[in-house]
Each structure stands twice: as C-alpha cells, then as structure tokens.
Amino acid sequence: MPMSSFKRKIKAIQIKIASPEVIRSWSGGEVKKPETINYRTFKPERDGLFCERIFGPVKDYECACGKYKGKKYEGTVCERCGVRVESREARRKRMGHIELAAPAVHIWYLESIPSVLGTLLNMSTSDLENIIYYGSRRVIERAFIVTDPKDTPFSQGDVIYETEYRIYRKKWDFEVEQAFVVKNPKSPVLSDIDGEVTLKTEKSITGREITWIIVKNITRATHTVLPGMILVVKDGQEVEKGQDLTKEMTIDPVYAPFDGHVEIDELSNTITLKPLTTSKDQPVVFTAPYGAKILVSNGQKVKKGDQITTSTSLPSVKSSISGTVRFGSNLNIRALEDGNFEVLSTGEVYVEQVIEERKYPVFEGALVYVNNGDQVKKGDHLADRFLFEEEYLSATEYKIFESHYPTMFDVEERTENDRPIVVITDIDPEVSKETGLKVGDIVTENEYEAYLQIYPEKIVADAGAQAIKKLLQNLDLEALQAEIEAELKKLPSSSSKAIKLRRRLKMVKDFLKSGNKPEWMVLEVVPVIPPDLRPMIQIEGGRFATTDLNELYRRLINRNNRLKKLLELGAPEIILRNEKRMLQEAVDALIHNGSDSEGKRSRRAVLKDRNGRPLKSLTDLLKGKKGRFRRNLLGKRVDYSGRAVIVVGPHLKIHQCGIPKKMAMELFKPFVLAKLLGEGSSSKTMRKVKKAIIEKEMPEAWEVLEEVIKGSVVLLNRAPTLHRMSIQAFEPKLVEGNAIQLHPVVCPPFNADFDGDQMAVHVPLSAAAQAEARFLMLSRYNIISPAHGKPISLPTQDIIIGSYYLTTVSKEFDSLKEEDVKWKFSSPEEAMLAYHLGFIKLHTPILIKVVINGEEKRIKTTLGRVIFNSILPEDLRDYNRIFDKKQINTLVYETFKRHGIDRAADLLDDIKDIGFHYATVSGLTLSLKDLKIPPERDEILRKTWEKVRIIEENYEKGFLTEEQRKSEIIRLWMSVTEEITKLTSRTLAEDPFNPIYMMVNSGARGNIDQVKQLAGIRGLMIKAYDPRSREIKSKIFKGQAIHEALTFDYPVDKNLREGVDILQFFISTYGARKGQVDTAMNTSFAGYLTRRLVDVAQSVTVAEPDCGTHEGIRAMDLIKEGTVVEKMNEFLFGRVLAKDVLDPETKEVLKNPETGKEYTRNTMLTDDDANFLASYKKMVDVVRYEEIDITELSLPNMYAEIAEPVGEYEEGTELTWDVVKAAKNEGKYRIKVKVYPVVGTVYAEEEPLYDKKGERQLLVYQEVINEIVAKMLEENGIEKVPVRPDIIVRSPLTCESEYGVCAACYGMDLSNHKIVNVGESVGIVAAQSIGEPGTQLTMRTFHVGGVMGASDIVSGLTTVEKTFEPYAFLREEKSGGKKEIRKYYGSESILCEVDGFVKDIATDESGRTVIYVEDYAGNIHAYKVPKRAKVRVEKGQKVLRGETLTSGAIVWWKLLELESEKGVMTAMNLLKIIKNAYVQQGVSIHDKHFEIIFKQMLSMATIVDPGDSDYLPDQLVPLVDIKRFNREILEGNAKVEENRKWVIGKTLAKRIIAETEEGELVELAQKGDEVTEELLKKIIEAGIKEIDVFEKDKVVTYQILPKEPIKYKRRLLSLKKAALNYPGWLSAAAFEETAWVLTAAAIEGKVDPLIGLKENVIVGQLIPSGTGLDVFAGIQVEETPRAAVEEELA
C-alpha cells in the first residue's frame, strides 16, 4: 500500500490587525437581527445570528426553502431564499459581520499593559478610558457672573466658570463679579414686627429683580389740605413738628380771559370757561380756591374781564409731629415749576413717625404674599422664600442678602462639578500657537464651547471611539518617527521620558513596518464567528442551551440597532452619548468580558448570566487551559483509542502487553472488516453481513482479529505523561477479561502500579506510523532513560525480593571453609538434580564446577546463586554476590553497555521470570515477631531522659537560655535516634532471612528509617510551617538553626510496634499532615514547572551535525559550599571534546592505555572514558631550564620564556617566533629558555597549596594554572605540582547553531549511548527530564547539625523555582538612582571581580565588615559586607573571579557583567545550585538538560547601543537576531560604494525626511522623485544611510552609508519571560498572557516561521523533528507482505 509523501504546506504564519475591508471580505453577509432561530419551525431567522443566507445551509446540499436539494446543485444560490447550496461544513467556516452605527475601540489595544493606544497617542489609559466611555473630569473652580457684557455675546447675569472665564478674558472685554452658590436657604420669610407693608422693586447689578418688603410700625398725624393750597413738602420728606406743610397765602379773584360761557363741576370744585365757537381760544379750567365765592352760575355767559370768583386767604397747614410726609392716596395735586405742588381737591397729607422698621429683600421668582399697605402681625408670612437653592449671586447681591439674612443661608465660593470631557481632533495652527493647545489635548466641554465661540470653525473636539479614530487617522507616522528620534537625541538615555519615548518609537516603527494603520484599532465592523463554533442545542423540556457568545452578540446587535434608530430620529446628544457608550461596552464584553490581565479591575461591568456567572467572551475562548490553543489545538482527542485498568502480566515479554479481546475488536474493527471483506464484493449487503459477524462476536471474527494484530504494535500511555517514556509501543496479545496486562518491569518509566491505575491504548494506523512505533517506541528499546543514560525499566518489589532470596546466604556461609562444605557437584545440572530430589536446598553451601571467562573453576557458592547466574551474560557472572536492587540495576546497565539493548531487554525478562518464581518459593510473610526491638533500647532511653532532666534543671537555674535548652535537647534526641537506628538494623541483620530485613536490605520495599519507626524509636517530629512566614525569616536572620526552630523538643520515644501515647500521637499528626499537604500542593506546582520548561525549550532540536565551534566549557567537579554536587566523571559522561586533551607532562594528545583511544577534539566520551579522564593526574615540574635549537621549525609545545636577553627582548619575555627571528638576526642558533610545563594544566589536589610562610594559598582545587601562578610557585620554591589535563568539552551553552543545537555540542543521546541524531527534540527531552522528578522535590526536612545560613532553608522545589525564576526572588530598590537588589530571604552575595588573595578582613569606622582582596598585580579591591551576610572566605585564601565572598543570593546580572559574552560562568553557578537540589533527593539528571534550559534563559540580550538597527536602547532582543544583524552589517558595509552607483536613475519608493542643524525637520525628496547624483549627495550629507527605490514594481532597499553594529548585554531571563519572548508568536500565545502576546504580535505584523514543535502542532502539520524533518519529506513508505519465516517467529 504505497503512501504519498508529505510536504510542509505552511511555511510561516503572519498576524496583523484586520482592516474594516478585510473583515467585510471574510463575511458572508451582515447580521442585522439579534434573533437566533424560530422557536416554532426551529429554522434560523433570516439576517439573524444563525442565518443560512450568511453562514450556509443547515442541511447538507439543501437551501432553506427546499427548492434545491442534492449535490448536483452545489454552488447554486437559491433565488427564493438566497441560500447557497453547499455542504453544512460551511457553517464552521463562513463568517458574518455587524456594521456598527458608531465606531468602537478594540479593548485589547486599550487595556494591554502598557496600553497600545496610550503609548501611540501619548495619553494615559485613564484619560483614554474617559474619552472612550464619555467620562467626565471633576473640576473645583470659582464661578463669575457677568455684570457688564459690553460688546460680547454675553447677557447681563450670565454665569461663567473660571476655566471658561480665563479663556474669554484673554480675547474679550467684559466685566464680572465673583459668584456665590446659595446652599440651604431657610424659608418662608416671616415678619419680625407688627406693622404696615411697603413693597419696592429694583434691578440688581446683574439685571435681576429684587423686591423689597418693608414692614414699618408707625404713628400717623393726618392733615387735610384744601384746593388751591400750595404744598411745600414732598412725599417721603422728613419734617419737624410745627413745620409748614402748605404756604399761608391770599388768592386773587379770577377774571374771564375771553368771551365765552362757564361750566361749574361741584364735585371736583372746578370752573371750566369755554370760548365762543367763532373764537380761536382754547377752553380754560380754574380750581375754585377753598373759601372763595363763585360769582357766576353754571352755563352763564361771560365777557372778557368779568370777575368769576372772589378773592380769599388760606392759612398755612403745620405738621403736628416730627416724621416723614406721606401723601394720601386721595390727594389730587399738580406739580409747579418751583418744585411745589398745587392741591386740586381736598385730600390728606400724613406725617408718619416710624417706631420700628424691617426690610426684607426677596429674589426674583419668589412668591410675595403681601401687598402695599397691608397690615401684618409679627410672625406673618411675607414670602415663600428669599433665595433659591443653588442660586448664583454676584458679590454685591451676596452682600445685600448676607446683611439682611445673616445665618439664614450658606454659600460656596468654589463649585465642584463633573464636566464631560472631549479631545481635540483638529485645530488651526494659528489658534494652536495662540492657545498652546494641540491635537490630542483633553479639555472639558465648557472649555471647548468657549474656544468654539472665540474661534468658530477653527477647533474641533469630540468624545467616544470616533474621537480616538480621528486622532489615529491624523497621525503621520513617518513624521512622528523623525520627531521622536530628534527628541531622543537631546535626552539622556536613562531618563524616564527617554524610556517612554523609546517605547513609543518602537510602536511607531512596528506600525510602519507591518503596514497596519493605527485607525484599524477602532472597529467599524465586528466579525461574527461561524455559527457552528457557537452552537445552540435543544435540551430536555424543549428549551435551548446556547454558547455565551450568542448572548454577547445579541446584546451588541440590540444596542447597535437601537443606536441606528436614535440617529435616524435625530435624538438629543446626551441620549446618543449614553447609547454609544453602551455599544462600546457591548463590543468590549464580546471581545473581553472581565477584568484585565494584571488582575486590576476594569471600569467596565462584567456581563453575567442569570446565575451570576460571567459570560465567556472571545478572549476567554482563546486563553487558559480550556482555551482554543491549549484544549483544541494542542490537546486534540484521537480516534482508535481505548482505556482500561491495568493488571500485571507476569507471562509477557518486555515488548508485549495484554489487550482485552473486546477492546482489541473495537480498536481494530475497520481492519477486521476490511480483512473479512477481502478482495471480494464490498456491496452494502456484504458489509452488513460482515459487520454482523463482528458485532455478534462469531468465531470467524476472532480468527481474523488474531491475524490483523499479528505484527502490529499499539501505544500505551499512562497519565500524567511526564516524560516520553510515559508513552511506549507494545505488541498486543489478546487476553480474556477487561483489563490491560502490563509487563512489571516497565512500571517505573510509566510510574504505574496495580492499585487501580488506568492506561490508554492508541493504534498507529499507517505503515509509517507502525514503523516509527516499532523501531523508536517499542518498550525493549526504551529501557535507558534519556534523563541520565542509566536504565529506567527495572525490576521492582517481588522480582527484587525473589532475586535477593535466591542469592542470599546464611550468616555461617562466609566463615565456612571449602573443605567443610558437605556437597560437591561437577556441574550445575547435577546440583539441580540434587535440589529436585531434596538433598540440598537453595541456600545450602556447595562446591561446584562452573565456567568463568572460558576457564572451568571450582567455587564455593549456593545453588540459588548458580541458578541466578545462569541467566546472566558469561562475562558478568558473579557466584559470590548477593544481588539486591542496586546490583541488579548495575547488572542491567553493564549488560546494555557490553552487549547492547536487546540482550539487556532479554535479561530483564529472565530476571522477571526467575524473580517471580523464587519470590513465590520464598513464602515471604510478615508478622509482628519479625519486628525485633533492640534489647539495649530501654536502657538508652532511660539514660537519655536523665540527661534531659539535667538540661531542664540547668535551664530553670538560669544557666541556659530558652533557645540553648531547646537546641541541647534536640541534638541529644537526634544522636539517640541515630544510635537506636543502628541498633535496630544490627538486631534485624542477625537473621538474614528475616522478611523485614530482606525487604529493606534488598531495596524491594521500605527503608531503614521506616524500620526504625516500627521497631526502634519514632524520634523528633517536625512542625507544620510556611517557609515564607515572618517567623521563619526572623529566625534565619537571628542565626538560629532552622531545623531547631521547626522541631518539637519533646520526642516520640516509643515505636509503632509497641504503640504511642495520646500526647505523642498528637505530636505525630503535624508531620503526617505536612506530608499530605506538601504532596498535594507540590504536584500542581511541579506540573506548572514542567509546562514552563517545555515552553522555553520546545523549539530546541538538533539542527545540524556540527556547528564548528572551538568553544566549550571546562570539565570539573561541581562544588557548592564545600560539598561535591557532581563528580567530574559524571560531568564528562556523554560529552564531546571541544579541544584535544593533552597529557599534562608531555603536552601530547592523551591516550587511554587500556583501550588505546586517543582523546582528540570531537571525541565522544563514554562512561569508561569519563572515569579514565576524571582520575588521570600526574606530578609535573613547575619549571625547567632548556636550551633549544632555533633552526628547527617548531617552538616548544608548552609555555616558555627566554632565560637570557635576545636583541631588544629582555629576559622573561615569552618565547614567540618574533623572539626567534631576533635571535637569528644576532647569529644565534641556540637559546636558553625557562619552560613551565604546569601552565595550562589544572591543579588536582583537594587541599590548597600554600606559600613558604604558610599564610597564603597559591593554588586551589581545580584552578587552571597560568604563567603568573606558575611564577609564584617558582618563587616559593615549589618544584612539582599534582595536576590533571585541562579538559574543555562542547556544550549546548557554547553551541553556535542559529536555531537549536548541533549534534557535536549536544553529544551523546543518553537513551542509546550514541551521538545524537539530527532532528532529535532535545529541548523537550530536557524539559521532561527536569520536570518529571519535580514531584519528588518536596520541601525537605532540614539538615541536622550546625547553624545554617539562608542557603539551607529551602531546598527541593523552591530551589528549582528560585533558579529558573531568578528575579522573582529579588526585589529592586532604587536609592539615589542606583538599583539595589535584595534577596527574598536575607541579603545579596558579594562577588569577587578579580583573581587574587584575601589580604585582610577588617571593620571600617561605621562598623561594617570589609574584605580586602589583592590581585596578582598588587592592587587592592575592597568589598563591603552587607549587614546580615556572613563572610565565606578567610585571610590568605585564594579567590577567583566570579566567586562569592559572602553568603546570600547571587545577583545574576552582576555575575553576567563579570564574565565573557557566553554566559558560561552564570550557567555553571545556576547548575551547581539546581543540581544540589536534585542530588539531595537522589535524582540523577544529566547536566546537558539543564544547559539547554539555561541556553534558552540566556538567549536574549538587552540593546546597549542600537547602532543602525531599528532596535531601541534597553530593548530585549533575541541574541540570534543581533548576531545575524551584525553579520549583515559587515556584509552591507562592504557594498556601499557599489550601491551608490546602482541607485542613480532609480525612483524613490518613500519620501525622505531629514533634520537640519537647527533641529528642524525638512523634506529632501518626495516619493516618486528620481535619484540624481546631486540628490544622492544631499541624502548622504543628511546622514541617511539607506533609501527605498522601485525596481521592476518592487520596493528594494539600498544601503548608501556604512552602518554601526549593535552593542548589547546578555540577559538572564526567567522561564516565564523566556517563554513569552519566544520568537514565534503562536507558541507564546499558547503559553500565557494570550491577549497581550497576540496584541503585540498583530501590531508588529509578526511572522511566525514555525520553527518550534508547538507551532506546527497548532497549524496541524508534522513537527520539524525526528522523522518530521524535511530530509524525510520525500520518502515513500509501503507495506510489504511478511515472509513466512517472520510469521512463524511472530
């Protein structure tokens, strides 16, 4: 069956911001209605969220109305319902869209940290939110009232707020008074006195009416005045008693002035003289004076000159009292020219004397209850109020009311208002210059209106998303880039403004580079995802369950439609604003319904369903464990799989598993069916018949199944899949029952046991998959762990006890002499016969002839040992050894090394069979009697309690402190516990066949600590604690031993065999609970650690056979604080040499005398090689004098100096070819030299080497000896030194492959002990190797012993976490501009910056300890010790660069700065710390796995000087990119001259902006201009280094000036940061912070080159690793029929 070869279809994936046009192009139509389906017909509503016209048909190849049915109409669009006839699969692909009635901002770009919109527009997030959500600004300000508007559009009395007033005042002339706001006026207005009311109205300064209610209590004198009298007083005039009110006067008679007739009006006492009709005279009216007699009668004719009245005299009227004159209301008077009044009729003039008066001003609008002249009583209501609440009064008005109504109202001088804000989107340049405003400034609505009145049509401001859109549209990114770059040149690079500007510049460049337009961050169109991705299903009771997204879309459509309607109706702005805000919130909720990524609550309300559960938005669909990335793209479910409980299969071979028949039939059903159908008919009837055969389980079905599974393999997986050995391939064997049978030896890699564990089965389908599974994943090829290169599939428990029982002997065996042995046999067969006949037992001592290394020998042994050795390879047999767990492990490993993986696998099977058999034969049982309690125990305890009593007495007497008492007791009980443990072990060992002793001693189950608790003493118990608690930290700082702080000082002195009392039981519960809690908490933590490790390292594969580097790392013992963490042989194992290993004495390539192997560069080191090199050392001369012949063509192969002057070269100069040349010029043929053989070797003694005086260390262990040190040794008379070769091995850390590592730098594939294959996923293997044992690294019970520093506190997982997240445990404190980093626990460790000697440790004036280090040149370096740190060095001690001088945390960036560019020293320090944590738990992991992780953590660098790159200072950039850029710069600089000639005559593809010397930006050339020599010269002079030109319709960039390379600084990143800074955005988005990663990538228009494994799994193509490499892409795979011989073997 030939298979087509695969090709990688997708090369890269780019992410960009979608423009409205792109969103519309995706769409199948606009969704206009919020409806989903019709609840009567269950069909989707037209134009709704499930519309068939937009998204495709619900039924396969059938339109909505049913007119077109069947595949033949595919592609037809129904003219009746508008639905395209196609597969219903379309409903998973086709999208819709919603046209928004108003723009809405995409929430990701607003709420990202830092905010993209905020950075680009140079606005704070809070301001942006206020603009977008139509927010307001709280303003506390004064108000003013216009008193004189002059020539302005204001009216008198208009209120203007201070902000507006400042704006108006600059341009307009008008007068104002400060305004006061009335608060709490008391009402109504009551009269304080009895009296009469007078009302008076007047206008205030602001043009508003004030009514004065005047109440007077008065006495009144009435004076009658008569017609004709002349009043000499005015109304309101003050008069004294007796003063004249009228004149005393004589009135002359009245004569007729013309002819006419008289009319007399007695009522008004007037005489009217009317002229004749012929006359031109006018009628005249006379008042008849009081007392004068009228001489004519009514109607009488008179002649001119006739007397009409007689003369009379009128006395004066005098005032009877002092007071105010008031004219009576009936008084009829006429004003005279002299200011007096003539009385025309009788009336009254009053003189009022005011006893009491009150005035009540009332503001306009108040209701006055009284009228003029009304009499009121005290307490009567005059008006409903005098002022209104919130009334604005001018200063003058305020004074009036304040003087009349003190304490009856309050005022506010300043008002507090929430003013809606707007952002300026356009402004006239002149106005901008005048006002200082610019586009993007935020003003309140009042301010905007003020500006608009002054500068009509010259300023535009707006709020909401449309305002942001306008701002983004107005951005000229190219000009902005030039402007920011110009500003950055003027600023110091470390200033906060420069950092902010650089961030902004990066964003501008990203937009320019990606071709994204900033306004696309504001949505005009919202895409609607396909309906099958947000399904709606019917549930019981006829109701429908739907995805939250549908609810979010429904809200959005409802609000959008409502806004459209309001816009059509021309609704008021305030309603529209509210509706737009709600629309924005609906879009926000759809995209991201909830608080932002940092946990800071958003200002938006979270939309919830009726149960109060937040609705899941599009962001929730992507992020987290249940998001699209991790659940659907990276965690697909697979078909052809099953799951069942596992049971042990003792009869199976290591590569076999038992599959239940039913399960196998289901898994292989299609294959069985195909086989049953055979070549014959595949008609429907035949298929049904054959299916029935399978379903009814007829005998034929089982026969065919047996045939089908022959030669197949299946994959077994046990969750949690912590490493690659958790999935292995097995050949299936059909078994009865329902459980999968598993070979017991493969339990350790699966971490499986048979207490109810379940395993999953998967069937590889294709021939290629079967081949891969068989050759790569079969369990017999996976017995060696890729984590450490030792066997992992190993016998356990019963098998171990069986083998141990078989090979163990009685106590007398060793002392029995050969001649005393009763039984002697000539062959193993003879011995077996004797055993079966019952003459001897398995453990009876016998003498037997066996073949050892080809020779027949007679040995003393037992039959058990003979039986066991019979299954071993001949060269590994040992008849005098007990085979416990450790021995069996060694045996399997040695078999693998000597005889290969297949023989090792067969041996495991044989051990399994023999172990199970003899475990059964042993009849192992357990009884209480087997727990032997040491007889001396009681006496030891009695003495100990006596010692405790003495300590307590000393404490009570005051000889000991509380801490000392506790410490003494704890140490006492610890030593006693140790003593009893040894006794218990010794007591049990008295009987080698004691079941408990056999179990513990063989390593089958349990350990001596458990036996100690069962039969000896439980000992001291630990308290439950939190390592981060203040109490613990304070104890550390006090220097108290931490184990003492956390231990009960009362022991459990009983054991479990005899039982404990109640108090001891309760003390025990602490430790028991702690164990449970730690395990539970650490499991999830270890899982998270593994996940971070995988994410960091997943793209590291073996990229090439050899990168060619000569760099490497120095092989050494890893020593942490005096403890050897890892021996050099372990360090060397599996490595490849970077340089030849030279013999320290001869300086020739070292050769292994046993194997004859030479250790040249690129040699891979096996176990034996590592052991040889690690143990190889020699005593070598420090110096020797030689005379060399310079006529030879070579110099000495070791460091040499001339021992006599040669030409210009003095004695002591290094011997070089230049020196030889000078000697030849002098005619010399031989010169004396001093040769230093020790230079370039490594000091190999653990004890330091001291100088003559014994004061100063000259050499320390593992120090590489250089010429300076060699001369010191010479000066101190040291002749020979023990040294070993300097071994430099290749490492992933120093590998120079651009992606991943090369095979030579990685070295051995630990799972097969061969050089690693190209394509191996070494990153994933590294992450699994480190993460898999994570659960074992629980918080450990602390070391026993002396006072410990902070380093001893937390080991295990916390140490691992601290190493992989180095900055999570450091706190930055800025003081005086410097960064000071403090440790999470304790202080910072001081690093030595030079090689030298500790000259002195002294205290300075301030009391601080100072370490003085003298370097080789004699310079002194002083290091101040932090207060809480402990000095780790002594006077005279030798210290090397990068060593720690004090306790505390290493500040990694300081260490990185100290070393070379590679970061090796930092990595080795990290390695020591982390290895220590794993070694303490007995976990073995090869260093190279850690190195791969550290390589990834060191894969980024911070830009110090960007040179001519687009990067910014302090930007974090992958090291690979920097190196590639610098390489390209060197290549580009070489082509500058050539490019200058080439661009002449080409057309510019971009305009060119440059900065003048004055700092102004000028345009040198437009897009489309031709490049002339003159223009090119201008461009070059302006310092522009590259230009874009058109070349055959393509834009090509040419470099025309040399460029500067990037200068950078290596960075050590935490795991999380390294994963988030991964070059491909797909993997980073699937890791954490999905929204932010996608946002940043979209802005940048980032291209994911799909180099890692995760990215390729996400896009659904073969991973670029192993057989997924392009090398294998063209391979054709086909199945061939198996040969008959093969069939038989199978």
Curated annotation (Swiss-Prot):
UniProt source species: Thermotoga petrophila (strain ATCC BAA-488 / DSM 13995 / JCM 10881 / RKU-1)
Family: Belongs to the RNA polymerase beta' chain family.
Role according to the record: DNA-dependent RNA polymerase catalyzes the transcription of DNA into RNA using the four ribonucleoside triphosphates as substrates.
Statement: the UniProt record of this protein carries the keyword Glycoprotein: no
Annotated cofactor note: Binds 1 Mg(2+) ion per subunit.
Swiss-Prot/TrEMBL catalytic activity: RNA(n) + a ribonucleoside 5'-triphosphate = RNA(n+1) + diphosphate
Enzyme class: transferase
Lineage: Bacteria, Thermotogati, Thermotogota, Thermotogae, Thermotogales
Stored PANTHER family: DNA-DIRECTED RNA POLYMERASE, DNA-DIRECTED RNA POLYMERASE SUBUNIT BETA
One MF term in the entry's GO annotations: zinc ion binding
Pfam families reported in the protein's UniProt record: RNA_pol_Rpb1_1, RNA_pol_Rpb1_2, RNA_pol_Rpb1_3, RNA_pol_Rpb1_4, RNA_pol_Rpb1_5
Binding positions for Mg(2+) per the UniProt entry: 753, 755, 757
Keywords: DNA-directed RNA polymerase, Magnesium, Metal-binding, Nucleotidyltransferase, Transcription, Transferase, Zinc
Protein known as: DNA-directed RNA polymerase subunit beta'
Enzyme Commission designation: 2.7.7.6
Signal peptide: none
Annotated residues for binding of Zn(2+) 1: 63, 65, 78, 81
Presence of keyword Glycoprotein: no
Residues reported in the UniProt entry to bind Zn(2+) 2: 1107, 1295, 1302, 1305
Cofactor(s) required for function per UniProt: Mg(2+); Zn(2+)
GO biological process entries: DNA-templated transcription
